Amino acid sequence: MRVRGATAKRRLIGLVAAVLLLICGQVPQTAAARWKPQVGLPEWWDTDARGRGPARIILLYNSGGMPAWTVDRLRYYISHVTADGTPDHWFFDTVLVLALTGESQRSFEPNYGKGPALAEDWQQYLDGRLFGGLSELAALEKAVHEANARLGGSSHVVRVIISIPYPDPRATKFGTVEGKALNFSRAEDRAEAVRWYLREVSRRWSASQFEHLRLGGFYWVREEAPASDDDLLKLVSGLVGRQLLPFYWIPYFGSEGSGKWQELGFDVAIQQPNYFFYDVPPERIDEAARFAREHRMGVEIEMDRRVVNSPERRERYESYLNGGVDQGYLYSGTLAWYDDAALLECGQSKDPAVRRLYDTTYRFVSGKYRKQWSNDARIEK
């Protein structure tokens, strides 16, 4: 009932905007922010998989060797920070913390790193960057706490999704978990490692007693789902479901298994268009959006730090935002951002053309975006 009401409201806003366009010759910014897309929207796109309303997820990578996510860096994602360094609005509501490699550079995702990660890598990730002395979750907690103080409240909470390392079958000598030597060529040992990891994350999360963070789910880090992983994924889905948490996946464009993600047990899947990175036509964004609609998926918005120095890359990024209006995913329940820390650099930049991307992204995330017919970068309050 709430979904249908939201859809009707969106149509009414579009109609009002059209009338104003005929009368005044221009579209007011508030109406343009929700201009009717070029395609019909499925009703389920108004909520995430558990009906909790929109989720805007920023992917924060903490692979081995990457710079730590400090409070000063995180605040540009938790809140919108003005050009003079002052937080003035909340920004992303959900953070996905994920690593592709451990400190050893062994791989949590089989397409990266120097061979499969071992038990010591999984343990070190838990003990270090997640919950130990280098804990970026603790930094995130502090960043949200400080933003609450600056924005005049104390109750804002950010959801956190934690990635699950891939139990790579090549790790025939994975190491010891709870006194048992595991061999990932055996399906039961792969399952045992994931079961242990989920227990450890949940136990340590509870012990941390975060005030401003909520454990919001788990993420499958491998971006493809070969048939050989079907049984494992269904088992992991059950383990995550027992904690009453959603299970997330973000497959690349054309990835094996992406069309059957629900059968595999995922609660939320988000489609990568992969337009920003490769020499493919802009129509890729439309194609990915259509696939996402047909398969009840969200859409990933993509950029990297090349936007700082390349006008062509900035234009590519804005194609995703304009596509959100044309294809309707601006209004979808779940969107994710891959940015390679680019939004941080954009937010700190003194170059107006670069800083503009940060402000424009904020408008998109907050539902105030209008399609870019001009270089107007004003923020709606």
Regions found by a protein language model. Name each.
Residues 254, 270-381:
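Substrate-binding cleft of secreted/luminal carbohydrate-active enzymes
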Residues 35-195:
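N-terminal catalytic cores of secreted or lumenal carbohydrate-active enzymes
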Residues 56-58, 91-96, 157-161, 214-219, ...:
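Structural preference for beta-strand elements that scaffold enzyme active sites
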Residues 157-168, 181, 185-197, 216-223, ...:
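Aromatic-lined carbohydrate-recognition surfaces of secreted/lumenal glycan-active proteins
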Residues 16-24:
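Bacterial N-terminal signal peptides
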Residues 70-81, 115-148, 180-204, 228-238, ...:
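Well-ordered, non-membrane alpha-helical segments in soluble/globular domains
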Residues 61-77, 223-230, 250-258, 273-283, ...:
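Acidic-and-aromatic substrate-binding clefts and catalytic sites of carbohydrate-active enzymes
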